[in-house]
């Protein structure tokens, strides 16, 4: 969601799903954190649109392009995917975050697994599958159905397949 778009300005009756971009993963604790204070203030305003459109689902997107830029979050997804303990912490935090903000699901936007120029590692390919599988299993244990989507970037997948 662009900063200039407020939830109240989103036309209803057009979309079945909305993804709010973004929330972040703390690189030290693996807990979910708002991208900024401004985005945190919009979470509940966006999920409140569900009261005005029957069947609308709102997901939180986590990560994004600059999440793998040089800096403290560059290897966060790789570190998360490589550790079941970190995943368990992440899952607990994510579920609490979604419940608190009334989200219906999550979109994992990891750009780019395995890309060494974006902080990736060769083992990301297999670890990502395990991460998504474990998250789906964990979400399926909850009384409410939560959606899970992933953002895949085709150029990375082609790069892996070429190896």
Label every model-predicted segment.
Residues 1-98, 123-126, 134:
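Glycan-recognition patch characteristic of GH18 chitinases/ENGases
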Residues 72-163:
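Active-site cleft segment of glycoside hydrolase catalytic domains centered on the general acid/base Glu
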